[in-house]
Amino acid sequence: MELNTLAPAPGAKSSKKRVGRGIGSGLGKTGGRGHKGQKSRSGGSVKPGFEGGQMPIQRRLPKFGFTSRKAMVTAEVNLAEIAKVDGDTVELATLKAAGLVRKNVLHAKVIKSGELSRAVTVKGLKVTKGAREAIEAAGGKIEG
């Protein structure tokens, strides 16, 4: 088998319908667009969200909330992922090196999810109460 000899199985592909090519094709004359009206004209599409002149729903409803910019550079790391980090200390740089958080992350928080079997020192990361207990139970400690 060669790349240049690959072909779909016979009957697997059907040829596309050519519109406006005679009555016998089933898509002649109007080409499947029906008679008259905006959508039958060329360029006659209606933009998404347009409701025929009625005030659109995205303008009828009030604005609310905002997107936190800090949330974009914050990551959550669970205990099972911390166990994958090489070495005894876990900090933002080691998490990035292990590929557990993206490069643009500035803040990280350790959450209690999964198991931690070895002692690690967590530096400069926020830690939830449950995760703190699990780290200390495994013989680890939390610094700053």
From Swiss-Prot:
Q: Which GO terms describe its cellular component?
A: cytosolic large ribosomal subunit
| Key words, A-Z | Ribonucleoprotein, Ribosomal protein, RNA-binding, rRNA-binding
Specify where the region named Disordered lies, as residue ranges: 1-56
Q: Which domain of life is it from?
A: Bacteria
* Bias (Gly residues) ranges: 21-31
Which biological processes are named by the entry's GO terms? translation
A molecular-function term among this protein's GO annotations: rRNA binding
PANTHER family, per this entry? 50S RIBOSOMAL PROTEIN L15, LARGE RIBOSOMAL SUBUNIT PROTEIN UL15M
Q: Kindly state the subunit structure of this protein.
A: Part of the 50S ribosomal subunit.
Q: What does the record give as the function of this protein? A: Binds to the 23S rRNA.
Regarding protein family, the annotation reads:
Belongs to the universal ribosomal protein uL15 family.
Q: Which HAMAP family match?
A: Ribosomal_uL15 (MF_01341)
Q: What is this protein called?
A: Large ribosomal subunit protein uL15
Q: Which gene encodes it?
A: rplO
